[in-house]
Amino acid sequence: MLFVSSSKAQKKLAENIRERRLQMELTQEGLAERSGVSLSTLRKFEQKGSISLESFLKLLSVTGG
């Protein structure tokens, strides 16, 4: 069985959301506004992978990713 550290998993989730945001031609500001997540939270997530479950689900609801 392959184990992935939680930090690596979080960073991969952040990469997926970022890629989907770019595919949708959304800026960070645009995604933050549409999702109701603060811009600083989104930036931190894309850089470090750190985010609350609630904020992650909000981003996911917009990106479908």
Question: Whereabouts are the PLM-identified features?
Answer:
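A generic secondary-structure micro-motif detector
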Residues: 7, 45-46
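Short, basic-rich loop-to-helix N-cap that marks the start of a DNA-contacting helix
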Residues: 48-61
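A short, Lys/Arg-rich alpha-helix, primarily the initiator
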Residues: 1-23
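Short alpha-helical DNA-recognition segment
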Residues: 25-43
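Helix-turn-helix/winged-helix DNA-binding modules
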Residues: 23, 34, 48-51
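Residues that mark the N-terminal boundary/hinge immediately upstream of a DNA-recognition element
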Residues: 16, 27, 52-55
